[in-house]
Amino acid sequence: MKTKQFNVSQSRIYPDIRDKYLDYMGERYNMFISDDTLKNDLREIFRKGTNKTIHFNILEKNSDLLVFETSEYSKLLEFTNHYLWIFRLVNDKWNLIRYRV
């Protein structure tokens, strides 16, 4: 059986955008926040400056780790710009790594 292969590479994030996400995680995130609230809040940060439809899917969520995937949707190209976001709490400080898939 042949499986689909894809390339994963670490993706650069502009410092001001990274800071907005990390500020949100430090101030608002806890594992008891509803998935819908979390999706809406992070999607709103993500959508700043664009009118694209954003697909957002939470893959893992606990007190010190949040992993989700995003992609942009357009009627012409379907889903594009796929990213994997990994937030990890280390020594009371949130870290963010984003991968382009």
Question: Which residues does each PLM region occupy?
Answer:
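Short, surface-exposed coil-to-beta transition loops
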Residues: 51-54, 69, 78-84, 101
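Short, surface-exposed beta-strand-loop junctions and turns on beta-sheet-rich folds
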Residues: 74-76
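Short beta-strand edge/turn micro-motifs at domain boundaries
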Residues: 83-101
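Flexible low-complexity loop/turn motifs enriched in small/helix-breaking residues
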Residues: 1-66
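A short hydrophobic beta-strand element
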Residues: 62-72, 81, 87
